[in-house]
Amino acid sequence: MWLQNFLTGRTHQTKVGCDLSDVAELLSGIVQGSGIGPCMFLIYINELLIELSKYNITVRAFADDVKMYVQILDDLDVQRLQLAVDVLCQWATTWQLSISVNKCCVLNVGKSACDVSISINNGVVPVVEAVRDLGVQITKSLSPSVHINDVVSRANQRAAAILRAFVSRDVRLLMRAFITYVRPIVEYNSSIWSPSSVGDIESIERVQRRFTKRLPGLKNMSYDQRLKFLDIPSLELRRLRADLYWCYKIIFGLVAVQSDVFFTKNFCTSTRGHQYKLYKHQTSACVRSNFFAERVVNEWNNLPKSVDFSTLPRFKRTIKQVRFSNLRF
């Protein structure tokens, strides 16, 4: 009864200055900012996700952003995906929602991926080479270069704006602005797209290198000297630490992810190193070897005994004392 009263009989007005518009009835939606709103939306959308999962496809959703994907081996797999899309359209029609074909897309992943044609309400869904998924550019080849070029461009623009806007010559203040407004751009979700190619690694590092070189009094220092003077790590080192933090969270159950999906524990009896070593899978594909679950294993297994695994804060603190020899910066 309470939910029914919450959803029905609602009205709103618009106020401009001291004037109020006529009262209008709200026929759909809920109050923005309400505590129960997100919970009600999950109840609303979960019905669709349960129905789509019956077609033996993988479904993921974040708010109203729904993704469906399946391995295409023959025409039957394409038909199965199309049936799931038809169910989505029928559900939207039932709930009086409109789906725009132009806001949907098909991404064929892999070198040997066949062209798949999917339609929504008699309109063909466009096939794209890349799509932005929760802020990360995912390409057909799964290469991070497109995303890296995008974030580097935005980060350089933000860094230049900071140097133009701040008249202060306080190095610490300028560096604090960089850490607050620029560094998050090139580090958001880095465990998803962390690069392996030298060109991409240097492209990202160049953002911090250029900014620190333009700080007052630091122009004639080398990049390593500037990092030591400012007491900051390289961006490459920060990405490696972020990988290890995520690895710790997954292994010790601090996130809602099953660890055996990503990692296989190594039950070897070797006394060298720590006791939480992982099994390293052999892979010949360059793209796969750079996935988070593959690239982090060697660094994780090579952590010294001095690292404290008892809690995440202690793990982070002791990780900062570890020297990694395979970094460029």
Regions found by a protein language model. Give the residues of each.
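Short, charged alpha-helical motifs in flexible N/C-terminal segments and linkers
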Residues: C89-L107, D200-C268
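Conserved pre-catalytic core of RNA-dependent polymerases
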Residues: M1-V31, V70, D231
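Basic, alpha-helical interaction scaffolds
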Residues: G123-S191
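Catalytic palm subdomain of template-directed nucleic-acid polymerases
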Residues: I36, V66-Q90, P195
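Short, conserved micro-motifs composed of acidic
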Residues: D19, L83, S98-V131
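Short, conserved catalytic/metal-binding micro-motifs enriched in Asp/Glu and His
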Residues: L3, G33, F62-D64, A92, ...
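Low-complexity, glycine/alanine/valine/leucine- and proline-rich hydrophobic stretches
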Residues: K265-W300
